[in-house]
C-alpha cells in the first residue's frame, strides 16, 4: 500500500533523498539495508518496528493486527492497514483469500500510486504477470479529477508462464 510507505516516511521525517534510498532498498528486497538505514535514524521503538514490517509477507489479513496496533498514533499508516483489512474482508466473501498475500514493503517506481499496489503471479512464475494499483491524482495532470485503478499485463512473463505450464493457445487467423 503506497500510503503505508508514505505514512512511514512522513512519521520518520524522511527527506526526498532518504525516501528514494529507502525505495531502492525495498525494490531490491535489501531488508538488511533497510534495517541499517532505520538504525541510523534515531526513531522511537514503535516506528522502528513499523519499518521492520516492510519486509514482512503476510499470508492472511489477520496477520496485519500487529501492524494495526503499532500504527494507532500514525493516522496515514493506520488508514493503509485498514484499507488492506477491508480488502481482506471482500476476498473472504468471495472465498479467494487463500490466493492473496499482503506485502507491506511492495512499492512502485511510479510515484502516482496512492493506495493499494498489487502484483499477480501464477504457478511456475517468480516474476509478476500483472502489476497495478490505485491512483487518485494521476488524472489531474490531464485536467480531470477521478480516483482510478489500473494494471498492466506483462506479456513476456505471461508467455513464459504459459510455456512453463505447457499451455498452448491456438491463434486463429482468417
Where is each model-derived feature located?
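Positively charged, Gly/Ser-enriched RNA/tRNA-binding surfaces
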Residues: 3-14, 18, 33-174
